[in-house]
Amino acid sequence: MKFLRISSLSLFLLSTITMGAMAQINQLDPPVMGWSSWNTYRIHINEALIKKQADAMVSQGLKEAGYLYVNVDDGFFGWRDENGKLQTHPERFPNGLKCVADYIHSKGLKAGIYSDAGSNTCGSIWDKDPNGVGVGLYGHEKQDADLFFNEWGFDFIKIDYCGAGQSLALEEQKRYTEIRQAIDAVCNRNISLNICRWAFPGTWAKDLARSWRISADITPKWESIKYIIGKNLYLSAYAGGGHYNDMDMLEIGRGLKPEEEEVHFGMWCIMSSPLLIGCDLTTIPKSSLELLKNRELIALNQDPLGLQAYVVQHKNGGYVLTKDMEQKRGKVRAVAFYNPSDTICSFSIPTTQLELGGKIKVRDLIKRQSVGTVTNKLVYELPPHSVKILRLEAEQRLEPTHYEAEWAYLPCYNDLATHPRNILYAPLKDASGGMIVRYLGGQAENYAEWNEVYSEKGGRYKLHISYVPGADRKLEVEVNGKKNDTKRSTNR
């Protein structure tokens, strides 16, 4: 078995055919599961409310299902004393937050807290909370980290960026690095950090955080769910190794239609997003609660490989996504048929395109039932705003025959509009997967990389690259650190 890493420098790139393989990943931190206060309560939280939600996590069976974090979001701030030490809100949390964290821990759960990379919190801006002014981490990094994690005992922190963007002229990578270093300097525990910059911040985030937001805030509306899924469709290369693209807190139990809730939860699971419930757990509808406790979907999210599903087909307005489960390059894969459109969508995909062969057992993870076997292709017709998520167990695992540009890791990519020449993933009708990568090249580090290119036996392979530049371009191809012949290529 061989595994190779292929890097390519170009300006426009569609797909490649090559070889390689991969190793197993062990003992990764899975995506965070729990509850957070922001979606339902915003800044209007208090000690009794947080404790009541912790109680409900246990009594509703959510702890048993794997939800462990109870996160106190914005709204607990009071002021800073003459020494700069944070004080909690005198009415909302008159006893401080240590007793809240202790109570959460007494339930066998973990406790999360919130702050901002700048001076002011998001609540001070959007909810006009005067207590959110001057209480952010800026200028108090070590002091607040010591308070949050050593004195109060919290285990997780979400760090927003509202105050940082208010005139401080801070740079995201530098700012979050300073905060991570401050936390590590004062706390010897492994603190889970979430970067909340409302867009994919850059490949540097994986070195600092367990997860990072990739979109604007979620709302309990279908258009919001659809928008966020769309933002994450082509970010699979950046998730893995115990670090994840965060699609924001869940809106299950807050008014979506049942089929839309299935899309919401199912796609969050197959894309390995953190699962932080955002509704009132004491009044959650029974159907929503049962969906959140679907152990087969949870297992998909918490799979030990820690992979995010990627798009293998985009036709008729629908998407097919897949990822390995249980074992890399094994015979078990998860597949999602996702219809975001407002009309019925027909799907048909050869099993070879999913790299599976022979007789394939099919299990519906939403319905939690086996639905027979297939051999050649999967064919479904889905209503609007719906998803079908399957576990496929095949007799054979087939070698891939091509790699799409949109599956590649782009070291310079971010969604903050600060990358070289606006490097981005862009739709193109005639592209093999319907997408291209634009504006590669121009500097040595601006390349596309396929880290886990697979061939069972290895050997010599002919590499074909499809691309659509507006003029001739020079391509450099590197395989496992060895540069291949470089030629000036013509448009294909």
Report each predicted region and the residues it spans:
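Bacterial Sec-dependent N-terminal signal peptides
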Residues: 1-24
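Aromatic-lined carbohydrate-binding/catalytic grooves of carbohydrate-active enzymes
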Residues: 49, 53, 57-166
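Carbohydrate-binding surface patches
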Residues: 268-271, 276-278, 314-356, 385, ...
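Glycan-recognition surfaces
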Residues: 140, 174, 186, 190-280
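Catalytic cores of secreted or luminal carbohydrate-active enzymes
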Residues: 266-312, 384-411
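Structural recognition of the beta-strand scaffold that forms the well-ordered cores
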Residues: 27, 31-37, 66-73, 110-115, ...
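Extracytoplasmic
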Residues: 345, 354-362, 370-492
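Glycan-recognition and catalytic regions of carbohydrate-active enzymes
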Residues: 276-341, 420-437, 441
